[in-house]
């Protein structure tokens, strides 16, 4: 799993936006991204673990919810070939930014 998390980190870096593992404190209004492991998502059959998985969340705080930032992240996630979905888009009044939140399932 560590090598797959490293691939995700490299993919997010390739978007051209700053991403940090588990987040950081930024000045209000500054665009940034974070990613972190959220939970296990194991595949189970006949009462046994068939494959171990991890759900990773990717968060991007941006001024533009539908343009280049979103497209850049989604292109990189698609290129990884793992299941993912855009889970929510919200306006964060305390930062003045739009918060995009993806869930990525990583197996193996």
Can you describe what each PLM-predicted range is?
Residues 45-51:
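Short, flexible, solvent-exposed loop/turn segments with mixed acidic/basic and small polar residues
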């Amino acid at each position: 799993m560590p090598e797959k998390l490293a691939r995700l980190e490299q993919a997010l870096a390739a978007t051209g936006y700053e991403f940090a593992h588990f987040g950081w404190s930024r000045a209000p209004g500054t665009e940034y991204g974070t990613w972190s492991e959220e939970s296990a998502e194991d595949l189970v059959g006949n009462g046994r673990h068939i494959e171990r998985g991890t759900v990773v969340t990717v968060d991007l705080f941006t001024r533009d919810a539908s343009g280049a930032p979103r497209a850049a992240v989604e292109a990189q996630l698609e290129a990884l070939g793992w299941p993912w979905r855009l889970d929510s888009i919200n306006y964060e009044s305390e930062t003045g930014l739009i918060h995009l939140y993806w869930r990525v399932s990583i197996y193996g």
